[in-house]
Amino acid sequence: MNKTITPSIETIERNWFLVDAKDKTLGRLSTEIAAVLRGKNKPTFTPHLDTGDFVIVVNAEKVEVTGKKASQKLYRRHSGRPGGMKVEKFESLQERIPERIIEQAVKGMLPHNSLGRQQFKKLKVYKGSDHPHAAQNPVLLNS
Protein backbone atom coordinates (compact mmCIF):
# COMPACT_ATOMS: atom_id res chain seq x y z
CA MET A 1 0.00 0.00 0.00
CA ASN A 2 1.27 3.48 -0.85
CA LYS A 3 1.63 6.13 1.80
CA THR A 4 1.24 9.82 1.18
CA ILE A 5 4.05 11.78 2.78
CA THR A 6 3.14 15.23 4.02
CA PRO A 7 6.19 17.48 4.25
CA SER A 8 6.83 19.11 7.60
CA ILE A 9 7.82 22.74 7.96
CA GLU A 10 11.39 21.71 8.83
CA THR A 11 11.82 19.63 5.67
CA ILE A 12 10.50 22.24 3.22
CA GLU A 13 13.39 23.72 1.26
CA ARG A 14 12.88 27.27 0.01
CA ASN A 15 14.79 28.47 -3.03
CA TRP A 16 15.12 32.01 -4.41
CA PHE A 17 14.27 32.67 -8.05
CA LEU A 18 14.92 35.79 -10.12
CA VAL A 19 12.53 36.86 -12.90
CA ASP A 20 13.21 39.64 -15.40
CA ALA A 21 9.87 41.21 -16.41
CA LYS A 22 11.35 43.11 -19.36
CA ASP A 23 9.18 42.67 -22.49
CA LYS A 24 7.09 39.93 -20.82
CA THR A 25 3.29 39.77 -21.01
CA LEU A 26 1.71 40.54 -17.64
CA GLY A 27 -0.68 37.59 -17.39
CA ARG A 28 1.70 34.93 -18.66
CA LEU A 29 4.44 36.14 -16.32
CA SER A 30 2.06 36.29 -13.35
CA THR A 31 0.85 32.71 -13.78
CA GLU A 32 4.41 31.39 -13.71
CA ILE A 33 5.23 33.46 -10.62
CA ALA A 34 2.05 32.34 -8.82
CA ALA A 35 2.83 28.68 -9.52
CA VAL A 36 6.32 29.01 -8.02
CA LEU A 37 4.99 30.93 -4.98
CA ARG A 38 2.45 28.15 -4.34
CA GLY A 39 5.07 25.42 -4.83
CA LYS A 40 3.29 23.73 -7.74
CA ASN A 41 6.62 23.18 -9.49
CA LYS A 42 7.77 20.84 -6.69
CA PRO A 43 6.96 17.16 -6.23
CA THR A 44 6.24 17.90 -2.55
CA PHE A 45 3.35 20.27 -3.38
CA THR A 46 0.62 20.11 -0.76
CA PRO A 47 -2.46 22.33 -1.25
CA HIS A 48 -2.89 23.19 2.43
CA LEU A 49 0.80 23.96 3.16
CA ASP A 50 3.08 26.77 2.05
CA THR A 51 5.68 24.78 0.10
CA GLY A 52 6.53 27.56 -2.35
CA ASP A 53 9.73 29.43 -3.08
CA PHE A 54 10.72 33.09 -2.99
CA VAL A 55 10.46 35.07 -6.24
CA ILE A 56 12.28 38.32 -7.02
CA VAL A 57 10.92 40.30 -9.98
CA VAL A 58 13.08 43.03 -11.53
CA ASN A 59 12.32 45.56 -14.29
CA ALA A 60 8.66 45.76 -13.28
CA GLU A 61 8.24 49.01 -15.22
CA LYS A 62 8.99 47.19 -18.51
CA VAL A 63 6.17 44.62 -18.29
CA GLU A 64 3.79 44.70 -21.25
CA VAL A 65 0.12 44.03 -21.92
CA THR A 66 -1.43 43.03 -25.24
CA GLY A 67 -3.92 44.93 -27.34
CA LYS A 68 -5.34 48.22 -26.09
CA LYS A 69 -5.10 47.25 -22.43
CA ALA A 70 -2.38 49.84 -21.77
CA SER A 71 -4.91 52.62 -22.32
CA GLN A 72 -8.09 50.78 -21.30
CA LYS A 73 -7.22 48.57 -18.30
CA LEU A 74 -8.36 50.17 -15.04
CA TYR A 75 -7.10 49.69 -11.50
CA ARG A 76 -9.54 50.59 -8.74
CA ARG A 77 -8.95 51.20 -5.06
CA HIS A 78 -11.17 52.58 -2.32
CA SER A 79 -10.23 54.55 0.77
CA GLY A 80 -13.23 53.26 2.71
CA ARG A 81 -14.79 56.71 2.92
CA PRO A 82 -17.92 57.77 1.03
CA GLY A 83 -16.90 58.79 -2.49
CA GLY A 84 -13.40 57.41 -1.92
CA MET A 85 -13.16 55.37 -5.13
CA LYS A 86 -10.00 56.07 -7.11
CA VAL A 87 -9.63 54.79 -10.68
CA GLU A 88 -6.31 54.74 -12.53
CA LYS A 89 -5.32 53.49 -15.97
CA PHE A 90 -2.54 50.97 -16.58
CA GLU A 91 -0.31 53.59 -18.23
CA SER A 92 -0.38 56.04 -15.33
CA LEU A 93 0.04 53.32 -12.69
CA GLN A 94 3.01 51.94 -14.64
CA GLU A 95 4.70 55.34 -14.43
CA ARG A 96 3.79 55.95 -10.78
CA ILE A 97 4.04 52.55 -9.03
CA PRO A 98 4.99 49.79 -11.52
CA GLU A 99 5.49 47.23 -8.74
CA ARG A 100 1.78 47.31 -7.85
CA ILE A 101 0.74 46.05 -11.31
CA ILE A 102 2.62 42.75 -10.96
CA GLU A 103 1.73 42.44 -7.26
CA GLN A 104 -2.01 42.76 -7.95
CA ALA A 105 -1.90 40.35 -10.89
CA VAL A 106 -0.10 37.67 -8.86
CA LYS A 107 -2.19 38.24 -5.72
CA GLY A 108 -5.36 37.54 -7.70
CA MET A 109 -3.94 34.16 -8.75
CA LEU A 110 -3.14 33.01 -5.21
CA PRO A 111 -5.68 31.52 -2.77
CA HIS A 112 -7.88 34.15 -1.14
CA ASN A 113 -7.23 33.07 2.45
CA SER A 114 -4.50 33.17 5.10
CA LEU A 115 -2.36 30.70 3.12
CA GLY A 116 -2.47 32.98 0.07
CA ARG A 117 -1.44 35.97 2.18
CA GLN A 118 1.49 33.97 3.55
CA GLN A 119 2.55 32.95 0.03
CA PHE A 120 2.23 36.52 -1.25
CA LYS A 121 4.82 37.69 1.30
CA LYS A 122 7.45 35.68 -0.59
CA LEU A 123 7.07 37.90 -3.68
CA LYS A 124 9.58 40.77 -4.00
CA VAL A 125 9.03 43.21 -6.88
CA TYR A 126 11.44 46.00 -7.90
CA LYS A 127 11.13 48.53 -10.68
CA GLY A 128 14.80 48.69 -11.61
CA SER A 129 17.26 45.96 -12.46
CA ASP A 130 18.82 46.11 -8.97
CA HIS A 131 17.59 44.19 -5.93
CA PRO A 132 18.91 43.81 -2.35
CA HIS A 133 18.74 39.98 -2.34
CA ALA A 134 22.14 39.12 -3.82
CA ALA A 135 23.10 37.27 -0.61
CA GLN A 136 20.34 34.70 -1.26
CA ASN A 137 21.95 33.71 -4.60
CA PRO A 138 18.75 33.72 -6.67
CA VAL A 139 18.56 31.40 -9.67
CA LEU A 140 17.17 32.76 -12.94
CA LEU A 141 13.70 31.33 -13.52
CA ASN A 142 13.27 29.96 -17.04
CA SER A 143 10.22 31.79 -18.32
Curated annotation (Swiss-Prot):
Gene Ontology BP terms: negative regulation of translation; translation
UniProt-recorded Gene Ontology molecular function terms: mRNA binding; structural constituent of ribosome
Domain of life, per lineage: Bacteria
One cellular component (GO) term of this entry: cytosolic large ribosomal subunit
Presence of the UniProt keyword Lipoprotein in the record: no
Keywords, sorted A to Z: Ribonucleoprotein, Ribosomal protein
Signal peptide: none
InterPro entries: Ribosomal_uL13, Ribosomal_uL13_bac-type, Ribosomal_uL13_CS, Ribosomal_uL13_sf
Disulfide bridge partners, by residue number: none
Oligomer status and interactors: Part of the 50S ribosomal subunit.
Role: This protein is one of the early assembly proteins of the 50S ribosomal subunit, although it is not seen to bind rRNA by itself. It is important during the early stages of 50S assembly.
Family of the protein in this entry: Belongs to the universal ribosomal protein uL13 family.
The protein's name: Large ribosomal subunit protein uL13
Organism, as annotated: Prochlorococcus marinus subsp. pastoris (strain CCMP1986 / NIES-2087 / MED4)
The gene coding this protein: rplM
